[in-house]
């Protein structure tokens, strides 16, 4: 069995996820590159963000924090053994494991990346969120037909593992 490490970022207010990268060896160079990617001037996920909260894992090395701070984002290491202070990230990890990864047999890094990409889209566009009044975070624009229950269609991802039901357009 091979262990892969997934680096992701989550915007706490909107719950938007950014899958930064997947690797077998999250060394200093890889972490620095991921930090550069998310702080890029035009397309970085952390642009116009003030803080980056992270746990005290040694993977968040000083050079990673320096690159993040060079992008005008203050890094804040959470106290030890305090997962409740990072509850949204912890919940996303649990959700992706239970709803997706635990039900798949992944045959390498590319299949992991594919599953994560599909789950990220499902999480953003098709999955209701209790903490957000059971609405979709970023719904796709649709022309739903109201009052006609026979016009419901099912959209599937990952071979039917992830399902989403919506009203068909007329």
Identify what each model region corresponds to.
Residues 1-170:
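Charged DNA-binding/catalytic regions of mobile-element recombinases
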